[in-house]
Amino acid sequence: MARFDRGSVSGVACGLDVPAIEVRGLSFAYPGATAPVFDGLDWTVPQGAFALLVGGTGSGKSTLLSLLKPEIAPAGERAGELRVLGEDVADMDVRASAERVGYVFQDPENQIVCETVWHEMAFGLENLGVSRDEMRRRVAETSYFFGLEDWLHRDTDTLSGGRKQLLSLAAVLALRPRVLLLDEPTSQLDPVAEKNFLHALFRVNRELGCTVVVATHQPRPMLEYATCAYRIEGGRVREVADLASLGGREELLASDACQSAPGAAPGAAAIREGWFRYDRAAGWVLRGLDVAFSAGAVHAIVGGNGCGKSTMLSVLAKTAKLQRGRMMRGAASAALLPQNPKALLVAETVRDELMEWASTCGYDEAAAQEQAARLGLASLEARHPYDLSGGQRQLLALAKLLLIGPELLLLDEPTKGLDLASRRIIARALRDHAKAGGAVVMATHDLDFAEQVSDDVAMMFDGEIACMEPPADFFVDNVFYRA
């Protein structure tokens, strides 16, 4: 792909001294909110930067980025100026927005709309009225740049999470935006897929001259590519003077918090010779899976996107049934937190969400308020769940499940989109659940979390468990899967 022309956008002069992003005096409040998200925020990002945007869960990172993209900007009261390459965002039509600003969401499922990779690549170009010849040229060129040509005719729903996120990036860049905004783009990727995605993003920045801004809670893997970083806190943005300061490894729990009770623990669930596939014409996702999980412990499952982790959790939750083999859970109650917490959120307010199962599960409002406070949700009870940040929705969904007290707690990527403080809250909650005799099984790409919080770590590969060991033994000899 040719280097994007930094000198102009749609024929409008745009010198290198013009910032890629310029925000002046931005104030913004969601409808019905008691306090604004931003109050007089100023922010400037130079052209050609690979910039990181860090900050706590709910600090406004996603809100700030989405306000720069008119088509997805949230409703609310707004004041101040937002400019991209010198043009006011409020004056951009759909074409101008597409040519200036590309946006990649945290979850590729929220972005991919077409059945095949080729059609997904062409979808945005079709909507802009690009000629068929130009469309084919751009799809071909972008596919070669990202190495998509071997799976160009695959169905999008057959792709791994890593490939879906790479496809989302490629489809956006086929529109040739000058500024690329990404919201937690690697939070659902395994370590190898994350490295591949970040390398592709680095090439976009360096080889194509595209300004890249990544909102993230996990900046450490990106520091080798970043040219600058900004922290959002208290409704304001400030530049991080020392990039290396973002690379430290933080403790999640006290050193003795993961000590299990002595003695043999009773079994909570097991799968024996489990085979499962989603379609008779498709390949097996689980292939003779043998695994057992004990009560009173936190079990972490790691492995590449598409290796079968989520499927195994669905089998344990009885939302999927093995075609061969047995799943043994006895009378133990179970609850599953899926990758997308929105699947559990149906009410109009946080309070109503927490009280949804109160009558059937036997807890009162005092218990709900206590759980909300424990998970950092006490000040959000009047908010609509969909007005929360992705991390706050994750905490809310977990709070709902903890209120019903399942003996088997199943979690699919429980820490995605969470800052250090929120990860600590979840770590403590999972250890407390295990200490009370519950079993926790979590599929995760957060290796630091797995090492510090779990009693054992299993690697899933090709539908089976390749190994299961205590964290100290599991991580010692790994090359790619290292905490």
Residue ranges and their predicted role:
Residues 216-217, 444-445:
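H-loop/switch region of ABC-family ATPase nucleotide-binding domains
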Residues 77-88, 325-334:
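Conserved ABC transporter NBD signature motif
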Residues 155-159, 384-388, 392:
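Conserved ABC ATPase signature
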